[in-house]
């Protein structure tokens, strides 16, 4: 943090148990998320509330996630009233919501970020930081690059970039994406090995992939998340 002049936190994402969250809290993590969204609502609330009570005594913030199953390929959604009740009953500090941002890539499902639902949640919880998972946005050229080295991927029907960016004024303070990074990392390694098939030094092809990822993430901060150069607005 001091070397780069920006504030840094240590966060546990998608914690899978109360015990793991407590272990991270005891070992210097700034923030933890307990993901019990696949469990019955009452059990989700009970576990996240327990972590919140433990974490808050240590000055650590906690993220929770709530949603319910629905028919169709969207699979899960978060209703505004459900979000309000969950925050009141758990005391969580941030809330992950599912409003069209499904995990994974389904080439047959045209994703649409339901901005109006996020706006409705924000209206009920105007001070609550909202978290969006599974927000990878990429174009046809991105998939074409992967396919040129054997990915055999169809162009996914991702939601529009402008819809994602619209949520930034609706409480979305933390935006997670991983699928694009996974695809690019694998693509870069394949590209390098096709050009250098006799290379056996992992430092070479991993170094190339790491630089591709660095450039990609820097571009996302500037053009997708629009948070580049804003660290001075935060309290260190």
Predicted regions: what they are:
Residues 2-5, 14-129, 137-157, 161, ...:
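Alpha/beta enzyme core
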